[in-house]
């Protein structure tokens, strides 16, 4: 079984985990090509392209100018990514067994690096998958990556007995590999997290992000291989809601005022 998640916009390179190995990302050549294109953008044009503030544009212009494919100043991506999903994952409390299970079973989609394993070393960057970066005749990153990401994941998953994918990525990122759903022996399960608000269950983005991280960690810590066991997830007051679920979507709900 494979878990798919999105990266985070925020990176923290202040800490380095010397006990973990560091590996090279598979799509390093593509990352280099994208960075070379992004180096052509000045602060103002990067601000417009990424729809970010002038301050963030300046920061990321500098990042791209200084970017290196070398692992010398890199960090393992699972340790470096921050944000709500990664707060839920909470790698700081992982055992070595958890880390290595994650490296085998967790994949992080990335606008720059394509597909990352947790131990893959990354350098500072910001590039969301939905960015309309034109390069080499491709109008955006979805076109640029094409079937490369699906092919990479399929090679990985073909060696597994359980060929299920647990989709804990955002729509923006899973869209890059959405056609994987049409491949015969692949089953894609998407956990969805909803809060009870104003008389109905709704997806509250920031809470859903953290819940996706909690579910990711639940799978990793418990070494789950049976999809039925996902229904046992009950962190932060969430419970499996059979009535709202179907074969493809597992819905977990909670009353925000009655957290555990």
Swiss-Prot record:
NCBIfam families in alphabetical order: PRK02101.1-3
Name of this protein: UPF0246 protein Cbei_1739
Superkingdom as given in the UniProt entry: Bacteria
Cellular component terms per the entry's GO annotation: cytosol
Family: Belongs to the UPF0246 family.
Pfam families recorded: H2O2_YaaD (PF03883)
Protein source organism: Clostridium beijerinckii (strain ATCC 51743 / NCIMB 8052) (Clostridium acetobutylicum)
Entries under HAMAP family matching the protein: UPF0246 (MF_00652)
GO biological process, one term: response to hydroperoxide
